[in-house]
């Protein structure tokens, strides 16, 4: 069962003045209960070592750690699960590798992909980009709130809106049926990460 509502996705390029681990620790201390390690440019060894460090931080705050795409590294680092890209590792295969208790998320950018992810055993999906955002420009124009509503209505698993999500936009996403929001720059790009997390918590009425 997915209990979190705010899903932090890492991008260490946004954290230039200190280690990513410190920023994630601040976010978890403020209430984040799920973190996706998404650093696609790192080699396997560096990603594994970072996953180990983030796993310790997440565990100390009772937060879940998911590793983007790499089920092997998620298993080696004893992470809580894996987040599969659209068209990437099938959720059912990821579960065979990580076990039945693993959390399996899937990125989706269309209604068809959302239905496919649910069919193949995803525990939750992200859908977007809902709003315009530089971090998701490669996925094309924003999907918008109506498509988010269509997806949230069509699937029975939790949907997290991603792409340009800010505290001011949270209520619109929840009103469309989203379970919560996935966030990158609005938290990691903030000068006060703990305050940014609290702003999301206030907008959602709890994390």
Residue ranges and their predicted role:
Residues 12, 131-133:
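A short, flexible beta-alpha/helix-coil linker loop
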């Amino acid at each position: 069962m997915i209990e979190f509502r705010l899903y932090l996705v890492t991008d260490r390029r946004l954290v230039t003045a200190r280690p990513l681990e410190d920023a994630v620790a601040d976010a978890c201390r403020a209430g984040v209960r799920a973190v996706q390690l998404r650093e696609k440019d790192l080699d396997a060894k560096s990603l594994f070592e970072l996953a180990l460090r983030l796993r310790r931080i997440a565990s100390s705050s009772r937060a879940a750690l998911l590793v983007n795409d790499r089920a092997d590294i998620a298993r080696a680092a004893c992470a809580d699960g894996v987040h599969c890209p659209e068209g990437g590792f099938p959720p059912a295969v990821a579960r065979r590798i990580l076990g039945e208790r693993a959390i399996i998320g899937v990125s989706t950018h269309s209604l068809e992909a959302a239905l496919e992810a649910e069919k193949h055993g995803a525990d939750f999906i992200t859908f977007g980009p809902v709003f315009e955002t530089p971090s998701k420009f490669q996925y094309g124009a924003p999907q918008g709130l109506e498509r988010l509503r269509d997806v949230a209505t069509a699937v029975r698993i939790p949907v997290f809106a991603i792409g340009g999500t800010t505290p001011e936009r949270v209520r619109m996403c929840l009103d469309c049926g989203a379970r919560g929001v996935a966030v990158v720059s609005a938290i990691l790009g903030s000068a006060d990460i703990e305050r940014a997390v609290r702003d999301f918590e206030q907008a959602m009425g709890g994390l």
